[in-house]
């Protein structure tokens, strides 16, 4: 019954037939589940009827003698090569839902990464797109890769996320984009939660949203990595049904799947099964059991065929992989498929995505300019920061509360000559607090955003420079407001000179130090392979910066062989600038009630702190150089990370 239903889908009845066929075969379903499947049927049928999607060429992918090897051992001592994929050949056609299966470690994800263009170095063989050698940048624009983990920005609503995707990927009028987004959300059953933030979506909704985001520009090729991972059976059925519908709409849909249920297994059009990096079966689903039977492997009557082939590949019935490898290499799969279903798998003459005779050469340029991408990404990043309770609200409140606490602790000491060292302690702590308040939130959040950036950039949403400029500029207003709020509290409460120019310089130095610290946080976040690494490296890098700041040890007392380290401490220039701002600029004598006050004259304070010869403009200049250098270095690290992904 299920087989007939699948054939009906091929004839154009829509994947809803699958839902009804399986339901009738399994017996009477509870009314709630029946209603749910009815809704799924309606949504999936709609997924084939997109009217506003841009027209694209249908794509067939062929790979010949594909192999992949990696170097073993650490970078300083390579021990040779390890081959992960060996001599894979085959063809994935339009209008087909292809499942790549195999036990853990078989090479499924590696194989799909190579097909998608995410891995290049170490690959041998040939990949053809519509019979021509693949041009990677062009292919990346006509394909999309939906990863196993649905990395979404948590503070955007479903509709906002979709509009960002549409604005980046399409050059149409805004009304057309809105109609397209509405059509996709309706078809995928997400319209009811269009104003819900992505962090509050269920697993199935997140997966469908990840598909919807990539569907905006109607990619002819779609790659899915373990799309059913972590989902319940109903959500798994929805996702696979949706993929099948997208495939039968004229796309080539390829997914890795570990061990599907029998119901999901029958929904695939073709299988490509791997074991130990080699192919042990390729062909239509219905041909798997007869093919294995011809090789002397009999699947038990009530056993899930997907479970059986995984057990065979894992060696539970003996080491049969060499025999299966040879059978595929000798063309037994192809012969068995032609024998069992002659002419059944021929492609339809017309593809609704785009007439095959057009087959245009697509450009690899982006749909929008770099400036447009920057504006869209700036707005998205700014909105995300504004809505982030931890990153923004807590950060703002911490500056207010710490400012009040410090103001009370150092109340009215700024003009007291007997408390000069207390005041310098206040100035140093201000630099310390502003540094960590800017450094750590960036260190903690940027690695989490890296996964979203990598997915969107590799799926050709935008350029690296547009993203980085938007990320750099969007947080600047917050890095200005928070230090100014802190300075406005502590400067006056601690009784510093009541001069507007000194207050403005004090605030400017605080802002400059915070921006440099944030730049260092971006660099650490971009270079770190995980959040744990970033969390450790962030505070550790602060230790030498503080140690050579000039507060704990003056420059003259630092050993000669370590004095160069003092020039690399950006806190030194911020702290030095604050000392010059408070006690320099020809400030008059300080108030002192004691009989002896050696620090009544501010020049003595400057001499004691070894900043008498320092220039305030040089401190600003060096902080500016630090800011630009760290931002540029973070950009280069991001660029390297993107290239290393391939």
UniProtKB/Swiss-Prot annotation:
Reported function: ATP-dependent transporter of the ATP-binding cassette (ABC) family that may be involved in the cellular efflux of sterols, in particular cholesterol and desmosterol (a cholesterol precursor), to high-density lipoprotein (HDL). May play an important role in the removal of amyloid-beta peptides from brain, in a process that can be antagonized by desmosterol. However it is unclear whether ABCG4 can directly transport amyloid-beta peptides or whether peptide export may be facilitated due to changes in the membrane lipid environment. Induces apoptosis in various cells.
Membrane side Extracellular: residue ranges: 415-425, 494-503, 554-617
EC id: 7.6.2.-
Protein name: ATP-binding cassette subfamily G member 4
GO cellular component annotations of the record: cytoplasmic vesicle; endosome; endosome membrane; plasma membrane
Top-level division of the source organism's lineage: Eukaryota
MF GO annotations: ABC-type sterol transporter activity; ATP binding; ATP hydrolysis activity; protein heterodimerization activity; protein homodimerization activity
Subunit structure: Half-transporter that forms a functional transporter via homo- or heterodimerization. Homodimer. Heterodimers with ABCG1.
Main location, first listed in the record: membrane
Species assigned in the record: Mus musculus
Additional remarks: Whether ABCG4 is an LXR target gene, is still under debate. Studies performed in monocytes, and in one astrocyte cell line indicated that ABCG4 expression could be up-regulated by oxysterols and other LXR ligands. However, subsequent observations in a number of different cell types (primary mouse cells, oligodendrocytes and neuron-like cell lines) have not confirmed this observation.
């Amino acid at each position: 019954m299920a087989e007939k239903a699948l054939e009906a889908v091929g004839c154009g009845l829509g994947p809803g037939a699958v839902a009804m066929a399986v339901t009738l075969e399994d017996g009477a379903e509870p009314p709630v589940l029946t209603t749910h499947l009815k809704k799924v049927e309606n949504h999936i049928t709609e997924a084939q009827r997109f009217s506003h999607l841009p027209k694209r060429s249908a794509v067939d992918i062929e790979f010949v003698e594909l192999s992949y090897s990696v170097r073993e051992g650490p970078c300083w001592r390579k021990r040779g090569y390890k081959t992960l994929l060996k001599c894979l050949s085959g063809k994935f056609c339009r209008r087909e839902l292809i499942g790549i299966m195999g036990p853990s470690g078989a090479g499924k994800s590696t194989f799909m990464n190579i097909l998608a263009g995410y891995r290049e170095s170490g690959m041998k063989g040939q990949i053809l797109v519509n019979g021509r050698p693949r041009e990677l940048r062009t292919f990346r624009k006509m394909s999309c890769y939906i990863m196993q983990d649905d990395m979404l920005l948590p503070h955007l609503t479903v509709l906002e996320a979709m509009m960002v995707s549409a604005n980046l990927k399409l050059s149409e009028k805004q009304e057309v984009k809105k109609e397209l987004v509405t059509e996709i959300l309706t078809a995928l059953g997400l319209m009811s939660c269009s104003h819900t933030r992505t962090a509050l979506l269920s697993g199935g909704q997140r997966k469908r949203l990840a598909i919807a985001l990539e569907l905006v520009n109607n990619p002819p090729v779609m790659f899915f990595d373990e799309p059913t991972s972590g989902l319940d059976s109903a959500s798994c059925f929805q996702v696979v049904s949706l993929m099948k519908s997208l495939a039968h709409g004229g796309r080539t849909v390829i997914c890795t799947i570990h061990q599907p249920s029998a119901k999901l297994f029958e929904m695939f059009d073709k299988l490509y099964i791997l074991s130990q990096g080699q192919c042990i079966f390729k062909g239509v689903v219905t041909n798997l059991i007869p093919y294995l039977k011809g090789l002397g492997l009999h699947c038990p009557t009530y056993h899930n065929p997907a479970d059986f082939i995984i057990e065979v590949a894992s060696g539970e019935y003996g080491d049969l992989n060499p025999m299966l490898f040879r059978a595929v290499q000798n063309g037994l799969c192809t012969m068995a498929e032609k024998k069992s279903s002659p002419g059944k798998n021929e492609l339809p003459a017309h593809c609704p995505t785009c007439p095959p005779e057009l087959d245009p050469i697509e450009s690899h340029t982006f749909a929008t300019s770099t400036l447009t991408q920057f504006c869209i990404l700036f707005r998205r990043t700014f909105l995300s920061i504004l809505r982030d309770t931890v990153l923004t609200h807590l950060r703002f409140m911490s500056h207010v509360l710490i400012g009040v606490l410090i103001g009370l602790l150092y109340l009215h000491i700024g003009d007291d000559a007997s408390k000069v060292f207390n005041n310098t302690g206040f100035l140093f702590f201000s630099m310390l607090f502003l540094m960590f308040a800017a450094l750590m939130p960036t260190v903690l959040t940027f690695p989490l955003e890296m996964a979203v950036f990598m997915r969107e950039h590799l799926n050709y949403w935008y350029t690296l420079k547009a993203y980085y400029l938007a990320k750099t500029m969007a947080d600047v207003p917050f890095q200005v407001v928070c230090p100014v709020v802190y300075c406005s509290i502590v400067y006056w409460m601690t009784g510093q000179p009541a001069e507007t120019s000194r207050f403005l310089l004090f605030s400017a130095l605080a802002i400059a130090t915070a921006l440099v610290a944030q730049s260092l946080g971006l660099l650490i976040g971009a270079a770190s392979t995980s959040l744990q690494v970033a969390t450790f490296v962030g505070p550790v890098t602060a230790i030498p910066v503080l140690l050579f700041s000039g507060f704990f040890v003056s420059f003259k007392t630092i050993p000669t062989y370590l004095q160069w380290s003092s020039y690399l401490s950006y806190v030194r220039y911020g702290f030095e600038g604050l000392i010059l701002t408070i006690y320099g600029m020809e400030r008059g004598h300080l108030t002192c009630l004691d009989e002896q006050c050696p620090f009544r004259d501010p020049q003595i304070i400057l001499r004691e702190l070894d900043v008498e010869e320092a220039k305030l403009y040089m401190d600003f200049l060096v902080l500016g150089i630090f800011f630009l250098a760290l931002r540029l270095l973070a950009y280069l690290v991001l660029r390297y990370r993107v290239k290393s992904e391939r």
